[in-house]
């Protein structure tokens, strides 16, 4: 039980201290890809929604 809490604490601390990693900027050579990189985290949600649309199309068999 204690190991679980310490693991959660380590994960939270590393997330807080590395937040600059998540909000970093692309190098100038790749600046034109900024719009694509901004959309990329949302792409898995599209697949999740597609599953519901697909099931609705086949009447939730």
UniProtKB/Swiss-Prot annotation:
Its main location: plastid. It holds the Pfam family PsbK. InterPro entries: PSII_PsbK (IPR003687), PSII_PsbK_sf (IPR037270). Keywords: Chloroplast, Membrane, Photosynthesis, Photosystem II, Plastid, Reaction center, Thylakoid, Transmembrane, Transmembrane helix. It comes from the Eukaryota. It is found in: Plastid, Chloroplast thylakoid membrane. The keyword Chloroplast applies. It is a single-pass membrane protein. GO terms for cellular component: chloroplast thylakoid membrane; photosystem II reaction center. Residues 1-24 form a propeptide. The chain crosses the membrane at residues 36-56. One of its GO terms (biological process) is photosynthesis. PSII is composed of 1 copy each of membrane proteins PsbA, PsbB, PsbC, PsbD, PsbE, PsbF, PsbH, PsbI, PsbJ, PsbK, PsbL, PsbM, PsbT, PsbX, PsbY, PsbZ, Psb30/Ycf12, at least 3 peripheral proteins of the oxygen-evolving complex and a large number of cofactors. It forms dimeric complexes. Belongs to the PsbK family. One of the components of the core complex of photosystem II (PSII). PSII is a light-driven water:plastoquinone oxidoreductase that uses light energy to abstract electrons from H(2)O, generating O(2) and a proton gradient subsequently used for ATP formation. It consists of a core antenna complex that captures photons, and an electron transfer chain that converts photonic excitation into a charge separation. NCBIfam families: PRK02553.1. This is Photosystem II reaction center protein K. It comes from Solanum lycopersicum. The lineage of its organism: Eukaryota, Viridiplantae, Streptophyta, Embryophyta, Tracheophyta. The gene is psbK.
